[in-house]
Amino acid sequence: MKQALFIDRDGVINIDRGHVFLKEDFEFTEGIFELCRKYIDDGYLIIVITNQAGIAKGYYTEDDFEKLTDWMVEQFSKKGITITKVYHCPHHPDIDGPCDCRKPEPGMILQAVKDFDLDIKECILIGDKETDLEAGRRAGIPETNLIFFNT
């Protein structure tokens, strides 16, 4: 079984400016590349989990999100860092009703556990909101492996 670093996007990988979908508005947080490199060197997969309610709200499309994601992954790759997978939830409860993927629900994490044969007890989650940490708890990530990231 493998171990992974689950990492939120807006507020952890990039400065959260609210519904970022253009690379011109995307600013990486200080130290994010070094942080990810450390975990890769320690044998972790890097998996991004991100709520993207802007899709449900019509602020941007799935295609817009995918283009920005491809660009973001490429920036990591240029630094020698592999992002194993980016999972996203395009829903918003006021528009789509409840779903199992929008954090604090653990759906994205549980899907990654299945997709990559992860040992959830060896995984770490870094998030900037309580909903991120709660998703980790609900998925079974130990409390000591939940890290609050404050930019």
Task: Show where each model-derived region lies.
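Active-site neighborhood of HAD-like aspartate-dependent phosphohydrolases
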Residues: M1-I47
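Asp-based, Mg2+/Mn2+-dependent phosphohydrolase catalytic module
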Residues: Q3, D63, K67-T84, H92-L125, ...
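Short glycine- and Lys/Arg-enriched binding-loop motifs that mark or flank ligand-binding interfaces
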Residues: I7, N14, G54, C123, ...
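Active-site flanking residues adjacent to catalytic metal/cofactor-binding acidic residues
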Residues: I7-R9, T50, I126-D128
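Anionic group-transfer/hydrolysis microenvironments
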Residues: D10, Q52-A53, E105
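Metal-dependent phosphoesterase signature
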Residues: I13-E30, I55-D64, K79-I81, H91-D100
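A generic structural micro-environment signature
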Residues: H19, F26, I32-E34, T61, ...
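Substrate-recognition element of Asp-dependent hydrolases with the DxDx(T/V) motif
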Residues: I32, C36-M72, T82-H92, G136
